[in-house]
Amino acid sequence: MATSSDRLVWIDCEMTGLDLAVDELVEIAVVITDFDLNVLDPGLSIVIKPDASALDNMNDFVREMHTTSGLIEEIPGGVSLAEAEYEALEYVLRFAPAARTAPLAGNTIGTDRMFLAKYMPRLDTHLHYRNVDVSSIKELARRWFPRVYFNAPEKNGGHRALADILESVRELDYYRKAAFVAEPGPTTEQTQAASATIVEKWTARMG
């Protein structure tokens, strides 16, 4: 039987900007996968109505982005922050009921997590403290396997949270197939040999 630790909780947020002191959430999407990246449900998308001051604080770039995506027109009809947190947490609990077991996943997820910690603390603390950040794998692939990086699926989520997070799942699925060792992976002997080689290489430097 699957447990909460077998799940990845994928979250993408749209904000009025990136300044945690003044900006607020305007959309959140949640998608749940297993560790084979199978999407377990179509996902949840919620538009949030922020304080007027946060909307007034949006710079031209962000306002144009949310206008082009159509989000700006939906914000006036959005739910409260409290309602959005409740709905998002209830959704996560369906698939990962045990607290602090399911990692948060996404792209440049540290930014989203900072906003979650401030504005949706109950959701944030339910998730494991570790993150699965696709952008980290992307940056390593760009330097170690350029062909893998440059042939990654093109992204066109249009800055809507649900489309963006599904693209992140797809992106990790691609890197898993293109950059990681194919299943069933290396043998125990191969991994032990690799570990010994790396330890020997770093022993002198680490004292």
From Swiss-Prot:
Catalytic residue positions: Y129
Primary localization class, coarse: cytoplasm
Highest taxon listed in the record's lineage: Bacteria
Organism the protein comes from: Leifsonia xyli subsp. xyli (strain CTCB07)
The enzyme's E.C. designation: 3.1.15.-
Occurrences of domain Exonuclease (ranges): 8-172
Function according to Swiss-Prot or TrEMBL: 3'-to-5' exoribonuclease specific for small oligoribonucleotides.
Alphabetical keyword list: Cytoplasm, Exonuclease, Hydrolase, Nuclease
Keyword set includes Cytoplasm: yes
Keyword Transcription regulation: no
Membership in a protein family: Belongs to the oligoribonuclease family.
Lineage, opening ranks: Bacteria, Bacillati, Actinomycetota, Actinomycetes, Micrococcales
Protein name in the entry: Oligoribonuclease
Cellular component aspect of the GO annotation: cytoplasm
Group of enzyme by EC: hydrolase
Matching InterPro entries: Exonuclease_RNaseT/DNA_pol3, Oligoribonuclease, RNaseH-like_sf, RNaseH_sf
GO molecular function: 3'-5'-RNA exonuclease activity; nucleic acid binding
Cellular compartment(s): Cytoplasm
